[in-house]
A protein has these predicted regions:
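NAD(P)+-binding Rossmann beta1-loop-alpha1 motif at the extreme N-terminus of oxidoreductases
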Residues: 1-53, 59-62
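Conserved active-site and cofactor/substrate-binding residues in soluble primary-metabolism enzymes
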Residues: 7, 15, 35, 75-78, ...
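NAD(P)-dependent Rossmann-like dehydrogenase/reductase catalytic/cofactor-binding core
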Residues: 186-193, 218-228, 232, 236-320
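Internal alpha-helical scaffold of NAD(P)-dependent oxidoreductase catalytic cores
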Residues: 112-122, 139-226
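General beta-strand structural signal in soluble alpha/beta enzymes
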Residues: 96, 121-126, 166-170, 228-229, ...
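Rossmann-like NAD(P)(H) cofactor-binding subdomain of soluble oxidoreductases
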Residues: 54-139, 155-157
Length: 320
């Protein structure tokens, strides 16, 4: 048994806490809001995961734990740096469970950790996982990416169960690129379906989006084959087709003609692709990423959906 701290009591953090407890660990789940922590501790449920009970070995608290064998960081990428400044120094190693690119610095999550906690060992947990399915114990697979083989094996061993299979990978850059860029492509996939352009168009967009993920991963020092696995292709397929995908849902709304502000106001959860799109395009300077660039322009109000679609469809033909 290990002691696991999960920092962030949203749907994803709570699902990870449930999985860690299911794997036999002693778990502390940190919630930023004290009232929410009390409610979850008393009801043994997170309202965002209605119907799923928090196991008794999960302690919900608004106070940071003083120590843990592993600390899972399950807060949005845009809030990760500020959190690191408050986190007790004894909490290490760290497992980054966020996806995206920091808007201000263009850093990937593990890069933020390296700057905020220099010298601390860190891994990345990423893959095609919806929080409610993980919490419910449905079968899933994911990736623990870290250059340190002992760390990734230890994290995988601590969190794995027969229904939650964790694979190791020594390419955290490629794994993070897949997790970040797929949210942007998912907005485009939703817009295609929302606009009534059909399943053929979505399939083409997902496939060409995967090519963009691979080009960016290689440009940033990752490997193409990493993007072809769970952290890239797997996550891309789920996020571009799953009804529970927040980024895909936003794209659907935009494709149906909703204004971005209205679509965001109707959704309480963080839609990471909105902040990630412009940061990703900026980080990818010099890399050919027409789909992600079109999404960033659409979200910034620099182009209409019709103009973006026309621009993509009229690009010069080339070999695949």
């Amino acid at each position: 048994m290990s002691s696991v701290a999960v920092i962030g009591a949203g749907a994803w953090g709570s699902a990870l806490a449930i999985q860690a407890a299911r794997a036999g660990n002693d778990v502390t789940l940190w919630a930023r809001d004290a009232a929410r922590a009390r409610l979850m501790a008393a009801s043994r449920e997170n309202p965002r995961l209605a119907g799923v009970r928090l196991p008794e070995q999960i302690r919900v608290t608004p106070a940071f734990p003083s120590a843990a064998d592993f600390t899972l960081l399950a807060v949005p990428t845009q809030h990760l740096r500020a959190l690191l400044g408050r986190l007790p120094a004894a909490l290490a190693p760290l497992v980054v469970c966020a996806k995206g690119v920091e808007a201000e610095t263009l850093r990937l999550p593990q890069e933020i950790v390296a700057e905020g906690r220099p010298g601390v060992a860190a891994a990345v947990l990423t893959g095609p996982n919806f929080a409610h399915e993980i919490a419910a114990g449905l079968p899933a697979a994911s990736v623990v990416a870290a250059a340190n083989a002992e760390l990734r094996e230890a994290v995988a061993a601590a969190l794995s169960t027969p229904a939650f299979r964790l694979y190791g990978n020594d390419d955290p850059v490629g794994a993070q690129v897949g997790g970040a860029a797929k949210n942007v492509v998912a907005i485009a996939a939703g817009a295609v379906i929302g606009a009534g352009l059909g399943e053929n168009a979505r399939a083409a967009l997902i496939t060409r989006g995967l090519a963009e993920l691979a080009r960016l991963a290689v440009a940033l020092g990752g490997r193409r084959e990493t993007v072809m696995g769970l952290s890239g292709l797997g996550d891309l397929l789920l996020t571009c087709t799953g009804a529970a995908s927040r980024n895909y849902s936003l794209g659907l709304a935009l494709g149906r003609g909703e204004a971005l502000a209205d679509a965001l106001a109707a959704r309480s959860a963080v839609i990471e692709g909105v902040a990630t799109a412009p940061a990703l395009v900026a980080r990818a300077a010099g890399v050919d990423m027409p789909i992600c660039t079109a999404v960033a322009s659409l979200l910034a109000g620099q182009t209409t959906l019709g103009e973006a679609i026309t621009a993509l469809l009229t690009r010069p033909r080339r070999d695949e």
